[in-house]
Amino acid sequence: MEQNTYYFVGIKGTGMASLARILHDKGHQVLGSDIEKETFTQAPLLAAGIKILPFDPANLKPGMIVIQGNAFDDDHPEIKRAHELGLKILSYPEAVENEVKNHTSIGIAGAHGKTSTTALLSHVLAAVEPTSYLIGDGVGKGNADARFFVFEADEYRDHFLAYHPDYAIMTNVDFDHPDYFNDLADVRDSFETYGKQVQRAIFAWGDDPSLRDLNVDVPVYYYGTNPDDDFRAENIQRTPEGSTYDAYFRDQKLGTFTIHLYGEHSVLNSLAVLAVAYMEHMNMDEIQQELANFSGVKRRFSETDIADTTIIDDYAHHPSEIKATIDAARQKYPDREVIAVFQPHTYSRLAAYIDGFAESLSRADKTFVTPIFGSIRENAGNVSSADLEQRIDGSEGIDMDTMDKLLQYHNAVVVFMGAGDVEKYEEKYKELLK
């Protein structure tokens, strides 16, 4: 295999970090640039020996292949320099499509549940067959001889339209990016376009009306808990240890499966994984064992215990994700107080869903709201965290200087949620607890 030098502009991005590790695993030279601020994707890159540089056009050298992160436009100094040098430049989705096309590929799309489902499917398949995978939490593994390539297919700005996978999982369709899509129908149309590029089959959540009438060229198998779903979970038992259920494909029982994960969404995600494994004629006993072995994903219901407090870290940044995360906390800790600390992610998203956020956060026993985390594209807006607080009974604002407000809660489950840098609040709280 020809060895190349890949230069990533924005290498610390979650997808970019995953792809960098895949190309590195395959023996290519990999380096890249990003902001100096530390991120959770950084340590694994450095541990793999991948160099991370500050942005500087002088980093670019003849012969490099440049991978342009989604957050960076053509007027970025490094991208301009790459054009001047006549270097080959690939967008992140183009680079992913290049990697997946020589394998049996499964692209996981959906407004919510993409990363968790991608991680679960990657874990299960990799334990049974050589598998490459790209997960949206910065984890990636490359294997030149892989039978399968599992990857996250993000609908934001229609990035997933670069992909033509063998199989697609569609977890749900939701209006999650008001800065790009006009409405739910607009998002649904993008999913249908993606579906038309799938080569073999689609596995879609049966309860989502947007997915029920997809006009595509391959079979669509629905998964869920209803009698008319192709892949079904029945006799679901949810306990503080996880969930157990009987899985069926139409009239055929596939077995009884246990997952040590929480919330109804985790049952659905595991059912989608089963569907892929079944279609690829895999041994269900092995799949059963690997589902039970899976322990979770970074920033998806990640738990830490300090003294009598359980801290949960979760990427939830949309009302339905927050509802699912609080529901999962209540399943695992039915007798404890649940305290939510939420960092709104982008002004446009808070403005679009402020009532939904209020409704979901009201499921916690107490809610604290931090200042809004802006983005590269928007750092101001006509909405504030206080507007959200006013809609939630008994909620309060909190920031880095007032984290000691949380110390009044004992034997509680404190859930930190957000897609920005909510970890900084969490770390401050951990220091105070210690």
Swiss-Prot record:
It is found in: Cytoplasm. It holds the Pfam family Mur_ligase. InterPro entries: Mur-like_cat_sf, Mur_ligase_C, Mur_ligase_C_dom_sf, Mur_ligase_cen, Mur_ligase_N, MurCDEF_pg_biosynth, UDP-N-AcMur_Ala_ligase_MurC. Its EC number is 6.3.2.8. It catalyses: UDP-N-acetyl-alpha-D-muramate + L-alanine + ATP = UDP-N-acetyl-alpha-D-muramoyl-L-alanine + ADP + phosphate + H(+). It comes from the Bacteria. Pathway: Cell wall biogenesis; peptidoglycan biosynthesis. ATP binds at residues 110-116. GO terms for molecular function: ATP binding; UDP-N-acetylmuramate-L-alanine ligase activity. The keyword Cell division applies. Keywords: ATP-binding, Cell cycle, Cell division, Cell shape, Cell wall biogenesis/degradation, Cytoplasm, Ligase, Nucleotide-binding, Peptidoglycan synthesis. Belongs to the MurCDEF family. This is UDP-N-acetylmuramate--L-alanine ligase. It comes from Limosilactobacillus reuteri (strain DSM 20016).
